[in-house]
Curated annotation (Swiss-Prot):
EC number: 3.4.24.59
Keywords (A to Z) from UniProt: Acetylation, Calcium, Cobalt, Disease variant, Hydrolase, Iron, Magnesium, Manganese, Metal-binding, Metalloprotease, Mitochondrion, Primary mitochondrial disease, Protease, Transit peptide, Zinc
EC primary class: hydrolase
Gene3D superfamilies: 1.10.1370.40, Collagenase (Catalytic Domain), Neurolysin, domain 3
UniProt-reported outcome of changing H512D: In COXPD31; uncertain significance
Subunit relationships: Monomer.
Entry's Gene Ontology molecular function annotations: metal ion binding; metalloendopeptidase activity
PANTHER family attached to this UniProt entry: MITOCHONDRIAL INTERMEDIATE PEPTIDASE, PROTEASE M3 THIMET OLIGOPEPTIDASE-RELATED
Organism of origin: Homo sapiens
Disorder this protein is connected to according to its UniProt record: Combined oxidative phosphorylation deficiency 31: An autosomal recessive, severe mitochondrial disease with multisystemic manifestations appearing soon after birth or in early infancy. Clinical features include left ventricular non-compaction, global developmental delay, severe hypotonia, seizures, cataract, and abnormal movements. Death may occur in early childhood.
Full protein name: Mitochondrial intermediate peptidase
Gene Ontology CC: one annotated term: mitochondrion
């Protein structure tokens, strides 16, 4: 999944863009002259050996995190933030005194860049750095920059300097499309903060924004909070599956993979038992979002959240979800029948399918039908081989090579972080990817892409190179073998590299819309598209080799893996439709027609099909309501777009350079600087309808990978 700092009006937008040829300055010319640095090494080998960094650079100059001189020590965050805040004051004065024109947008973008360069970096360091002092300093920097952003979002003079530009039709008509869109995005961010309102309403909007931030934080913490039950209330033989604390049993998750039906049932009922405080927090969060949306001129929070997306409005989202649900219903029933059959076989006393059953039994069916034990695949997917595979694919599709570069002393936060230079065959160095791939204590468990610095065209004509981090949680190498990936780890690696390429190739003029800073329902398209490449034998065959024997991964093993993913896939997708629909209803018309739990019950029965379990409140564990409020449908829509792009542009030949260049030009190069549907149209050469999106998702469930793979020899 994708991570971007979101600071409101002048903060980073969640958006992604590709490359542009204009505006390459002296930096790129210099790089072209020395395209391959002597410090670069082949990427595959670099990931299959232990890093030598700490030994090689003992006497080198300490550079600071990501090469930022101030960040050689935690105190440097204070220096960096003070520097950014001083620069901000100067830029605000410039923006307010400059006559309206394109220069206004450039100043706003520089203002956004100076704040994001500290905030985005700090956003990453506060969760990923192993040293508490660095994490705390980064947290403080985030708070400080956040406070400044709140002030800027309520600075009337700053707002009016942009309003003067957008109110002058002649001036607006003279702006190029990208500049105009960036100006409108800045204005949109101002207005959702309520700056256009009178003083009293503006204060109310600010107060609501603060309240929403606090409620979001509280709700998020509550989604992971364990529940406990007195020991004597649980059958003795299942207690050992859970943690004990005195007279209580602690339940901290759903135990979805447990083979014992009773363990899964107990975990489901106890972990999802409603908590009154969490329920009140959710109700207040939804109500506050609705009040804020209405205050700034929207009929619902969903209308506000969907502005500028592919879907554009809640009506289109609901049409998409309802049509998808209709198309899936028969397949989902068949999946539940298949699960019921397996449950009856293993547990004849109780064969009714309950919500805690599908994840476990679909796994059992998969294992029985297809021999896809991960340990059979891991030897073919050493990390070095997978990185080499990515390198081959990117080179053939886009003319891009990945080179390992030795980081300077102090540049990385853990000695096993690798630094990659991303180099185009004719355009030179495009940016840097820091690969934080290995497990360590206190490291967050999610796989993520972080923007550390966005690309933009600087005033001197040079291009500010993008810098990103890819964070995974892979096992470390052992004495006898390099790091070996399961098929799902390999797919995740390709997924996150899709985000990274979006960042590298989104070479926009403006930082505000660079790389992955685009609408949510478009942002996952490049990453999901990479999953299709990761599941194609013609691609896998380029790199999957046994780390000891060098033997290629047999074609039938890839075929089995692909076919196994279709087991109960309709039921899995139906579950996502249910979640997305629930999200839309919660953020739709208020006051809600019922309690959040009653709405959950109705929606589950209509859009999923398995019975609601009394005295449970799954919505109180739905953490995505915070970060993806009214936009949870985005993953399904991004997958539909990626599926269409794959089938129409890459299915015949996954290494088609002309299709790769078109993909870069039409979909990656504009980031948030162009309407997402225009990018989709440019790539597909047609305007897809809701029915097209639904058909793309449903046809993926039918794809006979085995036949296709055998035909592709």
């Amino acid at each position: 999944m994708l991570c971007v700092g979101r600071l409101g009006g002048l903060g980073a937008r969640a958006a992604a863009l590709p490359p542009r040829r204009a505006g390459r300055g002296s930096l790129e010319a210099g790089i072209r002259a020395r395209r391959v640095s002597t410090s670069w090494s082949p990427v595959g080998a670099a990931f299959n050996v232990k890093p030598q960094g700490s030994r090689l650079d003992l006497f080198g100059e300490r550079r600071g995190l990501f090469g930022v001189p101030e960040l050689s020590a935690p105190e440097g965050f204070h220096i960096a933030q003070e520097k950014a805040l001083r620069k901000t004051e100067l830029l605000v004065d410039r923006a307010c005194s400059t006559p309206p024109g394109p220069q206004t947008v450039l100043i706003f973008d520089e203002l956004s860049d100076s704040l994001c360069r500290v905030a985005d970096l700090a956003d990453f360091v506060k969760i990923a750095h192993p040293e508490p002092a660095f994490r705390e300093a980064a947290e403080e920097a985030c708070r400080s920059i956040g406070t400044m952003v709140e002030k800027l979002n309520t600075n009337v003079d700053l707002y009016q300097s942009l309003q003067k530009l957008l109110a002058d039709k002649k001036l607006v008509d003279s702006l190029d499309p990208e500049t105009r869109r960036v100006a409108e995005l800045f204005m949109f961010d101002f207005e959702i903060s309520g700056i256009h309102l009178d003083k009293e309403k503006r204060k109310r909007a600010v107060d609501l924004n603060v309240k929403i931030l606090d409620l979001s934080s509280t709700f998020l913490m509550g989604t992971n909070f364990p529940n406990k039950i007195e020991k004597h209330l649980l059958p003795e033989h299942i207690r050992r599956n859970f943690t004990s604390a005195g007279d209580h049993i602690i339940i901290d998750g759903l135990h979805a993979e447990s083979p014992d039906d009773l363990v899964r049932e107990a975990a489901y009922k106890i972990f999802l038992y409603p908590n009154a405080g969490q329920l009140k927090c959710l109700e207040e969060l939804l109500s506050s979002r609705d009040l804020l949306a209405k205050l700034v001129g929207y009929s619902t929070f969903s209308h506000r959240a969907l502005q500028g997306t592919i879907a554009k409005n809640p009506e289109t989202v609901m049409q998409f979800l309802e049509k998808l649900s209709d198309k899936l219903s028969e397949r989902t029933l068949k999946d539940f029948e298949m699960i019921r059959g397996m449950k009856m076989k293993l547990n004849p006393q109780n064969s009714e399918v309950m919500p805690w059953d599908p994840p476990y039994y679909s796994g059992v069916i998969r294992a029985e039908r297809y021999n896809i034990e991960p340990s059979l695949y891991c030897p073919f997917f050493s990390l070095g081989a997978c990185m080499e595979g990515l390198n081959i694919l990117l080179n053939r599709l886009l003319g891009i090579s990945l080179y390992a570069e030795q980081p300077a002393k102090g540049e990385v936060w853990s000695e096993d972080v690798r630094k990659l230079a991303v180099v185009h065959e004719s355009e030179g160095l495009l940016g840097y990817i820091y690969c934080d791939f290995f497990q360590r204590a206190d490291k967050p468990h999610q796989d993520c892409h972080f923007t550390i610095r966005g690309g933009r065209l600087k005033e001197d004509g040079d291009y500010q190179l993008p810098v990103v981090v890819l964070m995974l949680n892979l096992p470390r190498s052992s004495r006898s073998s390099p790091t070996l990936l399961t098929p799902s780890m390999m797919e995740n690696l390709f997924h996150e590299m899709g985000h990274a390429m979006h960042s590298m190739l989104g070479r926009t003029r403006y930082q505000h819309v660079t790389g992955t800073r685009c609408p949510t329902d478009f942002a996952e398209v490049p990453s999901i598209l990479m999953e299709y490449f990761a599941n194609d034998y013609r691609v896998v065959n380029q790199f999957a080799r046994h780390y000891q024997t060098g033997q290629p991964l047999p074609k039938n093993m890839v075929s089995r893996l692909c076919e196994s993913k279709k087991v109960c896939a309709a039921a899995d997708m139906q579950l996502q439709v249910f979640y997305a629909t629930l999200d839309q209803i919660y953020h739709g018309k208020h006051p809600l027609r019922n309690s959040t739990t009653d709405i959950l019950k109705e929606t589950q029965e209509k859009f999923y099909g398995l019975p609601y379990v009394p005295n449970t409140a799954w919505q109180l564990r739905f953490s995505h309501l915070v970060g993806y409020g009214a936009r949870y449908y985005s993953y399904l829509m991004s997958r539909a777009v990626a599926s269409m792009v794959w089938k129409e542009c890459f299915l015949q030949d996954p290494f088609n350079r002309a299709a790769g260049e078109r993909y870069r030009r039409e979909m990656l190069a504009h980031g948030g600087g162009r309407e997402p549907m225009l990018m989709v149209e440019g790539m597909l050469q047609k305007c897809p309808s809701v029915d097209d999106f639904v058909s793309a998702l449903v046809s993926d469930l039918d794809l006979d990978f085995e036949t296709f793979l055998m035909d592709s020899e």
